[in-house]
Amino acid sequence: MMDISPTCYGYIDDEQDLALVFQGVFNGNLRCIERRPYDAEKVELVNPGNIFVFNEEKSGIKRWTDGFSWSPSRISGKFLVYREYNRLGSTHDLPLHNVPEYNIFERAHRKYFYTGLLKKTFSLKFNMDPTDSTKLETFHLIAYYTEKDIHQGSLRRPSENPFFHKFRPSQKLLDALQKVAVGNGRSNPSKNNERGRTKAHNYKTRRSLSSSPSYCDLLSNYNNHPGNIPVRTAVQLPLTTFNNAPREMHQQQHRQQQQYLLPIDEQNKLPLPYMQHQPQPIGVYNPNYQPGLRRTVSQPMIFCNTYNTLPQQPTAAPYERRGVSPSVIYSSNTLSPIPYQNIDPYSSRSGPECNHSKAPIAPTMMPPVHHILVHDYRQPKPVTDSINPPNVNITTSTTNKNLDGIYILPAPRMNPPAQTQYQMIHAPDSMQHPPTFSKNNTSSNPKSHQYSK
């Protein structure tokens, strides 16, 4: 048999019901809960109509736990109301699930079933010691009920129960119930007054903002001209309301902003990207051409001090047909040497698969006056005997002409000398089989240790 039981049975609706129940507890006619119920007792104790009252200091219960799943609290007057939600739906038939039970994601997203059970709580701090008025004790009330019981009237309130008619709540208890804040059991009237003063201050602030001159002017303009829609941006306010800086500073900022609106001069225009310009010949300076990229120190530029006005087309030197780049280019008037850099990777290649790019010559430049002697490797090589190569000192005096009429002297070829054949000398048999030494063969003559011939 359980030694724990509900304090009373019924339904708590308002403060009058609270006063009757607490007065019965203070008089000793109703019994408080002295300990926390066990897990086996919770199922039988949590039933609609049961009302529990316990003293926090004497029972040691800081928080009431009954093992049920409840929703977040809702404020109802001075009470906190909770709804029971059963995750597995014990009051309904469970549907079949193909998902295993260990699937946490599926279990976390299951629907909660409202069972209809409600829990209403209330807390009160009351002085039970007449000798010490500062000593307060905390009393908690827990009541269970269902909506069906309320609509059907199966649960009676303490004010409707004849058993509670003999209890007369004291004025001290009624004052303590009046001081309880809404939604909790903490009585702090000073904080409530402070909250009220804060609300009044905020209301006065909003009233003062609405009565500002700019807002009143806007409303008066709207009343005089009903067709216009009141817009706050149309109000003209002095410049000092936005910024306290002097007027000269604003004028200077205005002038700086106007400079960005001026048209750009032709000489101050920035160059366009490089891909928007047509490519120019490499190594030739054109004064009318404006490249998209700026020339740096590492990028050489070929130019002449004087220019020839004759409309002369560029001509290619004879060596250009063979893909040989000139080493020096001379100007037409000053004959000053200008270094030439050929960047074309295919200029030194030959063959039908390579498109020859001729060395660019400016129209103001003359062809080179000096030809470069280049060995023509297209001439047939002299046939030599691989077994007996010719001597190195022998030089051929034959000269050949290339297609341009230039005499070409073949370069001397370094031929390796003939290998010298050496005769193999075999060692005598005595070297192959050295004599053996023994103890009897020892002597002081050093010649005796020599090999026998």
UniProtKB/Swiss-Prot annotation:
Organism superkingdom: Eukaryota
GO function terms (MF aspect): DNA binding
Protein name (database record): Uncharacterized protein YHR177W
Polar residues composition bias: residue spans: 433-453
GO BP: positive regulation of transcription by RNA polymerase II
One CC-aspect GO term: nucleus
Record's compositionally biased regions (Basic residues): 198-207
Residue ranges, annotated region (Disordered): 183-210, 428-453
InterPro entries from the UniProt entry: Gti1/Pac2
